[in-house]
Amino acid sequence: MDSGLRSLLSDHSRYVESFRLFLLNSTEHQCMQRFIDTQFPHIVSSIGKDKSVIDILGIGSGSGEIDLQMIGKIQSRHPGVAISNQIVEPSAEQIIGYKERVAKAPNLGAVSFSWHRQTSSEYERQVNEEKQMRSYDFIHMIQMLYYVKDVPATLRFFKSCLAPNGKLLIILVSGNSGWSMLWKKHGPQLPLNDLCLYVTAGDIAQMLSSMGARFQSYELPSDMDITECFIEGDRNGEMLLDFLTETCDFKRNAPADLREQILCDLKSPECSTTRDGKVIFNNNLSVIVVERD
């Protein structure tokens, strides 16, 4: 890794801006929405059986857009049952956005929300120190396992937090996505550190199998328009490139040979296709649903 490269996560405002651009340019949330509309209701049909309150834990929930969609489906599947929703999210900006979203949302009268500004590791440490293990009927970790130091330990801990019939839902980039190729080839040259791990759903499936965990996997086709990355001086393109490489100001700070190689690889068939003159990146996701033992 070149010591002049800094993780995008070291500049929180830039990370949030690049993430918002990523969502605008990709079908990330749309493909999750399709999954929530079609497959998700069946997945949560058995959670919280015979309980008066369904306990939910969101890890790295961001601004809550996907959370509220899932809560809506859980409400439909379990009418009249109260929901306690605990949110663990390290970003103050995202928590503010989540609270604003809740304030505008209808039909949440039976749902209580509690926000905890902390990382998943901090939450785990707090639970262990207080020795007050709380069990949850549904735990979700969407696009966040890149940001933990010890993935297998994190999986084991949150799996242990599941109540009877509980489900742990994980969403990550697919092992057949453009991300996988990009990370495997260039990860050693990018600012891989305590802030970010280059891990795919394929890696998670292997870890869960080695634990003897029961789980199911679902593939979510998704793409992202990265055409602007190839336009010189285009700020949106530069921000998207930051997000793709998890590097702060990659275009300006990366060595010329690395920059050219990554731009070349982003256009390769392993990463992208060309459609109507646009470069469309393979952003495929995988959903993994883990069951309690």
Swiss-Prot record:
The record's subcellular locations are: Cytoplasm
Q: Which GO terms describe its molecular function?
A: histamine N-methyltransferase activity
Which branch of life, at top level? Eukaryota
One cellular component GO annotation, for this chain's record?
cytoplasm
Q: Which CDD domains match?
A: AdoMet_MTases
Tell me, in one coarse class, where this protein mainly resides: cytoplasm
Q: Which Pfam families match?
A: Methyltransf_23 (PF13489)
- Keywords of this protein's UniProt record, alphabetized? Cytoplasm, Methyltransferase, S-adenosyl-L-methionine, Transferase
Which Gene Ontology biological process is one annotated for this entry?
histamine catabolic process
Q: What PROSITE patterns does UniProt report for this protein, alphabetically?
A: SAM_HNMT
Catalysed reactions, semicolon-separated: histamine + S-adenosyl-L-methionine = N(tau)-methylhistamine + S-adenosyl-L-homocysteine + H(+)
Binding-site residues for S-adenosyl-L-methionine, renumbered to this chain = 60, 89, 94, 120, 142
Q: What is its EC number?
A: 2.1.1.8
Q: Where does substrate bind?
A: 28, 283
- Which protein family is it in? Belongs to the class I-like SAM-binding methyltransferase superfamily. HNMT family.
State the protein's purpose: Inactivates histamine by N-methylation. Plays an important role in degrading histamine and in regulating the airway response to histamine.
Q: How does it assemble?
A: Monomer.
Q: Provide the protein name.
A: Histamine N-methyltransferase
Supply the gene name. hnmt
